[in-house]
Amino acid sequence: MSIESSKGVWKSGPGRGRVRPKGRQLDDLAWSQVQDLLGQRPRRRDLLIEFLHLIQDAYGHLSAAHLRALAEEMRLSQAEVYEVATFYAHFDVVKEGETPPPALTVRVCDSLSCELAGAAQLQEALQQGLDPKSVRVVRAPCMGRCDTAPMLELGHHHIDHATPEKVLAAISAGHTHAESPDYEDLAAYRSAGGYARLEELRAGGDWQEVQAQIKQSGLRGLGGAGFPSGTKWGFVRSNAGPRYLAVNGDEGEPGTFKDRYYLERTPHLFLEGMLIAAWAVEAETCFIYMRDEYPAVLHILAQEIAALEAAGLVPAGYIDLRRGAGAYICGEESAMIESIEGKRGLPRHRPPFVAAVGIHNRPTLVHNVETLLWVARVVREGPECLNAVEHNGRTGLRSYSVSGRVKKPGVHLLPAGSTITDIIAACGGMLEGHIFSAYQPGGPSSGLLPASIHDVPLDFDTLQPLGTFIGSAAVVVLSDQDSPRAAALNMLRFFEDESCGQCTPCRVGC
């Protein structure tokens, strides 16, 4: 093959030449727009999902021209960029010749709690009452606000106890952005002694003494798996560095909202726990993977991480906040790590486990948000804050996310040995006119239990004889006015939608 110097064209045969490479051509305007959005950010492969968010946020969709330009800018194949963009539900990929979606999207939650509260009727009313050319109305999986069902997301603005009237009023007022609640900021947290223990440990603490405290407390992973937290630290430390810490904030199990509840109120209790764990395993970087359904939390964390950097408590860039994109499977730790690396969120085969081969193939400590809240408390108050609490033969405390037919849904911090009877009582009892009939003990993955099983402690290891488990302690209470069959179909529909399709039984059946 030679170059025809007079034309600057690659020649590969008589009369054959090509001025541009084969395939979809690069649009100069789209390339310029992508370059402007990315600015001075490094064009690293692991930032691909962050860059897709920038384009989606700016233009409301991902056009073929922008995807082509992003591939060029990052020196990736178009296929790589396209497969990642189409994997995640929150990216609207628009092919050439297709009409982009309307500028405004209403996502109506279709989780079990919201369905019980009339979400289907709400969605139907909105589809009939809004102009589809200007507003798109779609159903969406749980957004972690089950205590205020039915709820929806208008742009990035959540409307609790939603009605068509509330939605129309919000559209008219232009309320489409997230609203941050009042929370304890860095100054308030430090005034009450926050970060003092972290600074003491950094000045001369023994990580093994802290690990012993965590073990004595009985703290286990509170994202659902329940692995002993202190033991996990030892596994990660046994592998040569550099090491990382990853926070699993992808609270996607329907009915679960405890992490959001705490992060919207006391973000620094979580952040200090994270930094203590990072100190213990000598983590080079902390990655926080937070679900896209929590825009207010993302804003709060971005603000407070910047405050930590300004105060000199962490160097710039030490905490890397990453934004999910609407994939339930990324709640699984290895799928989350794939997503942090800018890939599709497909779970890895194990072994090796992430404690040895995690982010960028380095040892990685993975913890849930609530677990790290308790790390901070145990290190500050001592292991007794957990192990001194006993009820029904169980030790410790649990944050139960309770929704459904109870008077006071919400996050209830109760002894880990609490039964469903205890939990309903903590919620003020059943709603008027409703008789307790069944419950979901730990999200849809745990199935349904009848009201007759009301005296079993809802904790780790207590529900396995019944063929279920506590998981993330997402409790949904049903009454005699609800159909167990309809509830089961709701759960099955969720898993049908959210299956990544990697495993054959999930994809085609057993």
Residue ranges, per PLM feature:
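Histidine-anchored nucleotide/phosphate-binding helix
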Residues: Y88, T266-A280
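Accessory "access/gating" subregions that flank catalytic or transport cores
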Residues: L201-N239, A388, S401, L413, ...
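Conserved phosphate/anionic-ligand binding catalytic regions in large, soluble enzymes, centered on
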Residues: K215-F235, G326-E338, E496-V508
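Iron-sulfur (Fe-S) cluster-binding modules
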Residues: M1-A64, R68-A71, Q78-A79, E83, ...
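Small-residue-enriched alpha-helical segments and adjacent helix-cap loops
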Residues: L48-M143, D147, E209, F287-I329, ...
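Hydrophobic alpha-helical positions that pack around
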Residues: L298-A416, G428-L431
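Gly-rich Lys/Arg/Thr-decorated short loops/hinges at beta-loop-alpha junctions or inter-strand turns
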Residues: G15, Y189-A196, L245-D259, V354-I359, ...
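Hydrophobic alpha-helical bundle architecture
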Residues: L413, D422-G429, H454-C506
